[in-house]
Amino acid sequence: MNELIKAINELKKEKNAIILGHYYQKGEIQDLADYVGDSLALAQWAAKTEADIIVMCGVHFMGETAKVLCPDKKVLVPDMAAGCSLADSCPADQFAQFVKEHPGYTVISYVNTTAAVKAVTDVVVTSTNAKQIVESFPKDEKIIFGPDRNLGNYINSVTNRNMLLWDGACHVHEQFSVEKIVELKTQHPEALVLAHPECKSTVLKLADVVGSTAALLKYAVNHPENTYIVATESGILHEMQKKCPQTTFIPAPPNDSTCGCNECSFMRLNTLEKLYECLKNESPEITVDPEVAKKAVKPIQRMLEISAKLGL
């Protein structure tokens, strides 16, 4: 393991590469990455890096976002099969048709989408900035929000809007069991529930804190004295435990106890071995059709500009 990590670091230096890791990656990848963060942070780092090569340890759409923002850089992913159930729930042709059927609507897309979906979007959001970006539009603005219906419903509730929602969802966040969380709360009455807004509303009603992975991490760091039940992909527990070694974090259980459904199987496809091979061979490489990229970059840049103004 140590030899492999050493070899990766040597290749990284030799090729002037940067490794970006999402909070849902395996712990050893998070520890090796130059920067670890949520989707917004990864996009921000990609946009300003001076590295020649960006290795995106996350899922495919994150690599696409980096490539759209940095068309002249080489963007690699350790495993091209690392997709996203949420992005897959929103095929670009179907979403484009949906937009066409609703003229006069502003289109807001969650970052968990393909570049082709972003290309028919007015502004992109992440779970960190979705509320603030939606609130930046007039109250009577007609908005299409996609693809996550759970996040859309949550944003509708906290902004008092009635956005038109695409019917997509993340398979991990859909799986959390209300009954089992209630049971855990009974066993640990002092525990606070931290939940990601991609969870169903029935889970969010049990939550003491609802927020993006970065927001949930920040809350735990600021209140390390609490015990937490964490309803998001379990990879975040690595960083939480690292930052708060004395704190007890309990992963919220899924409905199906026979599977590791609170883990994203796509995120887990990335390994140190694949990361080494990816850097060594400079492959697999993310490519985005230049015409699609030209359209997709505008809503992403708009998100980054609004986020910068809001201090996010």
Where are each of the predicted segments found?
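Active-site loop-to-helix "anion-binding N-cap" substructures in soluble metabolic enzymes
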Residues: 1-211, 215-230, 237, 242-252, ...
